[in-house]
Structure formats: C-alpha cells, structure tokens
C-alpha cells in the first residue's frame, strides 16, 4: 500500500486550494507521517490530477519533507506525459535531489505522435545521468500503447478546482465550456490529450449513468457523430450528464518507446490497473504480464525472459523495499509462478477484456498452491504488504 498524496492534500486543505497556509502544510506532514507509521510502502503522487497538480515544485518539496533522507520511495504520475514530459521529468529529478529519497516515475511514456521516438530516449538519458550523480530515480512501464483513467483528465487540470461536483455545475455554463474549448484547441502547458491524439483515440470505457451506457466502448468522435454534435460539445455533455463519473481508454503511446523503456536496466513493469464496476476494463487488468512475456519477449524479442521476469519480481521488490519478496532464496517468501514461455497467451482484448490469460498454470503464494493445473485451489495465502 502507498499513501496517496492527493487524498492527503484533500483531507488537509480541500480539493481546490491552490495555495497552502502553514497550518495546512503542517497537517499534510502529520498525515504523511501517520501513514508511514501505519506501514505505507511510500507516497504516491498524481501531479497530472487535482489536487496534486496545484503544487508548485517548491511547495511539493516542502510537503514531502517527512520523506527526506528516509529511503522511502515516492511514486509519481508526472505533471505531464505529453509535450512537456521531459520538463516534467526534470522536475522530479529536482525533487529527488532535494529530498535524497528514491523517485519511481510511474508508467513512463510520451503521449502523441509528435513526441514518439523523441522524448522517451531523452528521458532515459536524463535518468541515467542523474543516477550517475547519485540520484535515485527510475521508472516503470505497462506493455500497452493505450492508457486508462478518468475522462476528466482530457480537460485542463485547473478545471477541477473545487472538485468534480463543482466541475459538473460549471459545465452547464456556456462561457466555461467555450473557455475549456479554447484551451484544449491550442494548449501545450498541460497534458492536452485531445490535441495530441485526437478524439477518435479517446474511448468512453465506463459510464456510471445507466441510460448513457450505450456509449461505452465508443470514441468521443463516434459519439459526437451519432449525436450530430462537435466532439467538444459531445464530451462536455457526457461529462455533465454523468457528473464526471466516466472512465476512458486512450490510445496514446508508441510500441517502440515501450521497447526502449523495457530494455532499460532500471525499469520495472506495472499494470496500472483500475477496476471499474461497470463498462469495459482495460485489457491490462487481466493481461499485463502475459502480454509482456508473449509479445515483447517471445514475439518481438525486445528483452530476454530473464530480464522480463526480474522487472516483475526482484527489481520491483527492491524498488518498493519488500525485503522478503522478489527472489528465490532461503528465508524469502515462497511466491512462485511456473510457466512455459511457449504456452503463454494473452486472451484479454480491448473488445473482450475480462479474460484470464493462458499458460499460467501453477502458482504458489507463501508456499501454498493457489493455482494448480490452471484451476484455483481456494487457497488465499496473500497478505497486505507493509513497510
């Protein structure tokens, strides 16, 4: 478990407070210390989301002072993954230097064709240079070119000041909509997904409001065409009607960039899964690790089987400080996954995502068989992992 910085900030200062006073900052420190004392493995930042997006770099460093010199990791969805992604990484290198504690950049990527094959190599180079200077910074990646998050993430982050109910109310205002549209048509100072990849690559994957669920699995461009609207109007109408409770799957990244990240010796693999109770899952919920093994190891030969397994086990355990996980050795937890690489197959797809992978037939958790001959044994030996 990680302590969520956004939740901590919202508890201390509300959802839409850009500037923090001394009492609010002190409460953030207290809550971080409380979560770490309870066993949190680290602190997770979402700088691309409200309310974390309201931190300046200086205020962020101040908020994270309880982690200074601790060796406790900070994981981060950076402030940008689009045209400003390299500068966003530089910001996190600055944070890592100031706090002298590890930073793990979550799901590293470069969004948009204009940034593919250009920003990712630069970021890998910058992290390597920082490590040579003694800075602990690395990254993880998921093996899919599509991401998934809340649909409001296509809007400028300042639109979420006050929370989603306030945003829903504001979307009823034509002037507010027009201002959003103007920002989204040209803005490069935020992760402007609609500009970078187009509405045809932004799919509404789950919608809370039942009478709108006919649009699940359709792109915003397709919804707009059906409704006879422009894509901005269709987007704003959908968000307003659903009280902003809509998730998306967005096709944003380049497979060659994923290969470059996987080849980096310091990267890990992440599923970055979310679990909506309605609509369409992202196939990574079921298929991340077999996609890595089947597609990137066996088919593309982007990395060796040994390296791939290490990124999912030993490397990941080291990053999170899990001292009894990740390797096979006396005294370690006996967590084993036995598979034949030639038989591994990802069954989950974007159109049919809730499908178990094939080939993962024997799994032990804490030395007890959880899956034998491909069937669940009923054993539930897993425990909550704490620091």
Please name every model-derived segment.
Residues 52-55, 80-86, 113-116:
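Acidic-and-aromatic substrate-binding clefts and catalytic sites of carbohydrate-active enzymes
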Residues 173, 260-266, 271-272, 288, ...:
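C-terminal cap of metal-dependent C-N hydrolases
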Residues 54-59, 117-119, 249, 283-284, ...:
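Short glycine/threonine-rich loop-to-helix capping motif typified by GTGT followed
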Residues 39, 77, 140, 228, ...:
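Divalent metal-coordination and catalytic microenvironments
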Residues 61-72, 76:
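Alpha-helix-loop-beta-strand connector modules within alpha/beta enzyme cores
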Residues 1-22, 26-50, 64, 94-97, ...:
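Active-site neighborhoods of metal-dependent hydrolases
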Residues 246-252, 256-258, 304-309, 317-354:
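Acidic, glycine-enriched loop/beta-strand segments at the rims
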């Amino acid at each position: 478990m990680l302590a969520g910085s956004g939740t901590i900030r919202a508890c201390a200062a509300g959802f839409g407070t850009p500037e923090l006073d001394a009492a609010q900052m002190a409460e953030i420190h207290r809550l971080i210390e409380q979560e770490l004392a309870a066993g949190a493995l680290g602190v997770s930042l979402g700088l691309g989301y409200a309310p974390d997006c309201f931190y300046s770099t200086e205020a962020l460093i101040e908020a994270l002072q309880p982690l200074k010199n601790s060796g406790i990791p900070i994981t981060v969805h950076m402030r940008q993954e689009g045209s400003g992604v390299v500068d966003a990484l530089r910001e996190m290198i600055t944070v890592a230097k100031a706090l002298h504690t590890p930073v793990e950049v979550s799901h590293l990527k470069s969004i948009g064709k204009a940034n593919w094959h250009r920003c990712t190599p630069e970021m890998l180079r910058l992290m390597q240079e920082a490590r040579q200077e003694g800075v602990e910074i690395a990254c993880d990646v998921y093996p899919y070119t599509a991401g998934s998050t809340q649909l409001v993430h296509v809007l400028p982050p300042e639109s979420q000041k006050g929370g989603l109910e306030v945003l829903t109310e504001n979307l009823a205002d034509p002037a507010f909509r027009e201002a959003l549209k103007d920002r989204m048509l040209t803005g490069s100072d935020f992760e402007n997904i609609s500009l970078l990849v187009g509405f045809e690559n932004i799919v509404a994957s789950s919608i809370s409001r039942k009478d709108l669920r006919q649009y699940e699995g359709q792109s915003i461009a397709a919804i707009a065409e059906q409704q006879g609207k422009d894509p901005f109007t269709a987007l704003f109408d959908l968000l307003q009607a659903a009280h902003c409770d809509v998730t998306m799957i967005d096709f944003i990244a380049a497979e060659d960039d994923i290969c470059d990240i996987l080849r980096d010796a310091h990267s890990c693999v992440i599923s970055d899964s979310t679990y909506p109770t309605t609509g369409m899952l992202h196939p990574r919920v079921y298929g991340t690790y077999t996609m890595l093994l089947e597609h990137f190891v066996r088919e593309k030969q982007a990395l060796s089987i040994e390296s791939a397994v290490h990124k999912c086990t030993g490397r990941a355990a080291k990053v999170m400080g899990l001292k009894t996980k990740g390797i096979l050795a006396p005294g370690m937890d006996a967590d084993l996954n036995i598979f034949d690489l030639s038989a591994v197959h990802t069954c989950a797809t974007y159109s049919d995502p809730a499908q178990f992978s094939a080939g993962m037939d024997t799994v032990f958790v804490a030395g007890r068989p959880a899956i034998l001959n491909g069937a669940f044994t009923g054993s539930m030996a897993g425990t909550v992992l704490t620091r």
